[in-house]
């Protein structure tokens, strides 16, 4: 009310008038202002590309081999652009991997701390892009604000900061495939252990990586209900999610 206030932005930790500061692609902590990680994952992926087993059967990473640089405004040819043409399963995994670096460096007992994260590109938007489409698809929602899988992954990872306050779980993707499909199933959860069930039969516990990612390899598709159950350190169920096979459209 008395003036002297300013909004924050990236690289403003040394500006006393800023209300917050942030970083792009770097891990940092602040002594004076709340410090938010902002652009820790620049990868891109279309919402309609589920995985390689789903229509339109987009091969993960397939697309352009050049893009226009936002810094030089020149086309960079013959570059590896796979990171900007993800399917949703690999896009979700990449977001988990990138955020884990920041979560691992979360606040301790010192006087320089990190205050969490924000998504600088929350929804797909008409800013500089690197994928085959002519707009940026780094968002956790598409341009119509329809959530992608990383939206739900962030709900899991961001429910609390120093420690998880409410255990959550999310099964990546859907459960509608051809009968001969055998594929990995990915689950994002803050639980200590995750067990997968298919039509009530246990498929065992997932391999845990990057704290939040659980992988179940070579799961053969069978129509019905796919359930993921998360357990706390005492072995008690703390969260549950399910996917149900949909019928064929009429």
Question: Where would I find each of the regions flagged by the language model?
Answer:
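Substrate-binding/catalytic cleft of secreted carbohydrate-active enzymes
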Residues: 1-157, 161-178, 215
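Short coil/turn motif common to extracellular beta-sandwich-like domains
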Residues: 179-186
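Short proline/glycine-enriched turn/loop motifs at strand-loop junctions of beta-rich domains
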Residues: 187-193
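Short beta-strand segments within Ig-like beta-sandwich modules, predominantly Fibronectin type-III
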Residues: 203-210
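Exposed aromatic-hydrophobic patches
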Residues: 213-219
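Extracellular Ig-like/FN3 beta-sandwich strand-entry sites
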Residues: 221-225
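Edge beta-strands of extracellular beta-sandwich domains
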Residues: 235-247
């Amino acid at each position: 009310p008395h003036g002297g206030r300013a909004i924050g932005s990236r690289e403003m930790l040394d500006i006393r008038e800023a209300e917050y500061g942030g970083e792009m692609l770097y891990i940092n902590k602040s002594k004076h202002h709340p410090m938010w990680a902002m652009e820790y994952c620049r990868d891109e992926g279309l919402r309609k590309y589920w995985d390689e087993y789903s229509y339109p059967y987009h091969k993960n990473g397939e697309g352009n081999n050049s893009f226009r640089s936002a810094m030089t405004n020149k086309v960079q040819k013959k570059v590896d652009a796979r990171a900007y043409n993800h399917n949703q399963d690999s896009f979700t995994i990449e977001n988990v991997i990138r955020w884990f670096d920041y979560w691992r460096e979360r606040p301790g007992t010192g006087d320089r701390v990190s205050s969490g994260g924000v998504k600088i590109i929350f929804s797909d938007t008409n800013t500089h892009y690197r994928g085959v489409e002519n707009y940026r698809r780094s968002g956790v929602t598409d341009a119509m604000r329809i959530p992608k899988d990383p939206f739900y992954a962030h709900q899991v990872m961001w429910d609390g900061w120093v420690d998880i306050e409410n255990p959550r779980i999310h099964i990546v993707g859907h459960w509608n495939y051809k009968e001969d499909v055998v594929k990995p199933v990915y689950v994002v959860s803050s639980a200590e252990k995750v067990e997968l069930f298919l039509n009530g039969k246990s498929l065992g516990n997932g391999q845990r990586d990057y704290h939040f990612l659980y992988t179940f390899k070579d799961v053969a598709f069978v129509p019905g209900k796919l359930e993921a159950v998360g357990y706390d350190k005492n072995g008690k169920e703390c969260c549950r999610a399910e996917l149900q096979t949909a019928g064929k459209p009429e």
